[in-house]
């Protein structure tokens, strides 16, 4: 799978969208805190950001494969997943900072 700089920028934008939801995630957790056994709210929110980003980036990269008529193999799927994880990993410190500030 060929990933362009434009694709990486799109993945970064998807990550920004996921992190923009941090206040909403805190609201969800706080509204149900009495019935959930959450020991670390910040880690829970981090997981919610991760799940949102992985879902959206996976859809973007799957659509890219379809739009470009590329073969969809397990290798190309894993390569796409690795690229998505790479973009996320580059921003972990910033994501955690945003969570701490919320």
Q: Where are the language model's segments positioned?
A:
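Short terminal alpha-helical segments
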Residues: 1-33
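Generic detector of leucine side chains in alpha-helical contexts
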Residues: 11-15, 61, 78
């Amino acid at each position: 799978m060929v990933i362009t700089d434009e694709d990486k920028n799109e993945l970064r934008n998807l990550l920004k969208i996921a992190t923009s939801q941090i206040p909403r995630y805190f609201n969800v957790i706080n509204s149900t805190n009495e019935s959930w056994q959450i020991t670390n709210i910040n880690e829970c929110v981090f997981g919610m950001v991760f799940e949102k980003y992985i879902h959206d980036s996976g859809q973007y990269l799957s659509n890219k494969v379809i739009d470009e008529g590329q073969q969809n193999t397990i290798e190309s799927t894993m390569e796409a997943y690795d690229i998505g994880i790479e973009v996320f990993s580059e921003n972990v410190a910033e994501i955690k900072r945003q969570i701490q500030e919320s």
